[in-house]
Amino acid sequence: MEFKTRFLQDPRQSFFLFGPRGTGKSTWMKNTLENAIYIDLLDAEVFRAYSSRPERLKEVAEAQKPGTTIVLDEIQKQPQLLDVVHQLMESHTGCRFILSGSSARKLKRSGVDLLAGRAAVKTMHPFMAAELGENFSLEEALGIGTVPLIVDSPNPKEAIKAYAALYLKEEVQMEGLVRNIGAFSRFLESISFSHGAALNISDVARDCQVERKTVEGYVSILEDLLLGFRIPVFSRRAKRRLSSHCKFYYFDSGVFRSLRPAGPIDAHQEMEGAALEGLVAQHLRAWNAYGNGLCKLFFWRTKSGNEVDFVIYGQDTFCAIEVKNTANIHAKMLRGLLTFREDYPEAQPCLLYRGKEHLKIKNVLCLPVEEFLKNLKPLNPLRGDMGSKPTYG
């Protein structure tokens, strides 16, 4: 299988690399880190060797030349190895360590402190459209997502169905993260209705027939496993009464679609709209993570109902983005952006839609969402990706 170049850059120091299962961490390391010593803790024999004698890592490290890179893949399987890594970094062996895993949750539960800040923390995300290049299809991304394990599968539709089951079995059930796997399965389905929407914990708890604090714990598990994320309301110098609820997203549009029930009474357009908004969200997160990581992602909603899907705020960035799953733009679709601009004239408003033309309506730039995603690359200023020769309307 041909290796697709990723935007993640090697920081040239010891670092943690986290990311959901199947996002390509191991593939990236094997193709990027030449001559590294690779220790795969998913391998049963390797696992047993380091489980019985963690000090084996010290023996391996001390036998290497200065500058050697040692990779510990799936470090959460053996968190006690972090103590050995810490000792080796303190003793200046000259080796650098790359510690990868699908979650930091078990490391935190084990009381480790991620090497007291001595190692950077990086995250691997699903493919960005620009990483896929000509192979990117918006329609496919909305259906199966962009997780490398799924995209590169011979049968992506079957692979995406099995993905949630894989996590339930290996990450949740085997690690004993929840007591009632049935309730957690219902929760995964229930919270899919909150994808791209305000997250009301009490409503989800009622739907799952569990206590509110149980759902709060479930949401934390999703976040720790990097399967979901919340974005807060943008409230800097607020001039209006704002919503207090965060918005929730699954980390990938295909994972969302696989968990969201679909039937005769479920609106296809509504699900596709939520998938499109989530696809933009996951791209914005990856753009920031692979770049300088200095921006923060918010949304904006007033008590009166005016809303902007995304607010990206950083030292040199202040953008407001609305996403519409339609090929035709109506003036009322701009209401949230125009209201936001009244309060924040410094912000650059942009509407992403399913059409083909570049438009400027009421001084709001309207861009084809597929083109926007394909042009979105780390370290490129977000406003640069919005530049175009618009048709005025």
For every predicted segment, state its role.
Residues 1-13:
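Pre-Walker A adenine-sensing motif
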Residues 17:
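Hydrophobic anchor at the beta1->P-loop junction of P-loop NTPases
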Residues 28:
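Hydrophobic positions on the alpha1 helix immediately C-terminal to the Walker A/P-loop
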Residues 39-68:
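Short glycine-rich substrate-engagement loop in P-loop NTPases that contacts/grips substrate
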Residues 105-120, 136:
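Short regulatory helix/loop adjacent to the ATP-binding pocket of P-loop NTPases
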Residues 158-318:
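Accessory nucleic acid-recognition modules appended to NTPase machines
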